[in-house]
A protein has these predicted regions:
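Residue-level signature of outer-membrane beta-barrel architecture
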Residues: 1-4, 14, 37, 49, ...
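Glycine-rich phosphate/pyrophosphate-binding loops
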Residues: 7
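Surface-exposed loop/interface segments of Gram-negative outer-membrane beta-barrel transport/assembly proteins
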Residues: 19-113, 129-187
Length: 187
């Protein structure tokens, strides 16, 4: 939208995808904005921004492998007591229904990319442009591994959790001088 002197735009989005197995999903939010302002024939400036926030739940990364290794005759619960079985004694496989509820992995990320510029035309055919483009990213990763998982083997070691966070900032600053001339060829 806008006028001859000011042009602007804004958009946003949302995306959600359910995973094939329990506790897997992906969610993303994004925003975009842009503005261009012309003060007069000598000065203009503007900027743009694009931001994305995403959350990815990875669930239990051993789940499908455990399901494919199980015999079709193995029951998730004891046929005698009705209790959940977390590890089968005959083949040392783990019950994927129990391990899937005791292990989680999540990744959150925020990405922000923007640009601001100033364009000056002091004389005809000469343009001086300066633009600054920062890029910021933040990633947080976390894992929870409960007692009833392959890693912990149901021992008294207790559950484990870990979290990491990574931030990164980079930028590009361009200064451009552009002079345009026309050369005509006459016959």
């Amino acid at each position: 939208g806008g006028t001859e002197a000011v042009k602007y735009g804004f958009s946003g989005g949302y995306y959600f995808e359910d995973g094939m197995i329990q506790l897997q999903e992906y969610t993303r939010y994004n925003l975009r904005s842009v503005i261009d302002i012309t003060i007069n024939k000598h000065v203009s400036f503007g900027g743009s921004m694009y931001a994305v926030h995403s959350i990815r739940e990875k669930g239990n990364w051993d789940l499908l492998r455990d399901v494919f290794r199980m015999r079709p005759t193995q029951h998730p619960n004891s046929l005698v007591t009705g209790e959940e079985i977390w590890k089968y004694s005959g083949n040392n496989l783990f019950n994927p229904l129990v391990t899937s509820q005791n292990q989680r992995s999540q990744v959150k990320s925020l990405n922000l990319q923007s640009n601001i510029y100033l364009k000056i035309t002091p004389i005809e055919n000469l343009e001086l442009t300066s633009s600054f483009s920062p890029y910021f990213t933040q990633t947080s990763m976390g894992d929870y591994i409960g007692v009833w998982t392959k890693a912990q083997q149901g021992t008294a070691k207790g559950a484990k959790a870990n979290a990491t966070k990574d931030n990164s900032l980079s930028w590009i600053w361009d200064n451009i001088v552009n002079y345009t001339w026309k050369k005509s060829v006459h016959s």
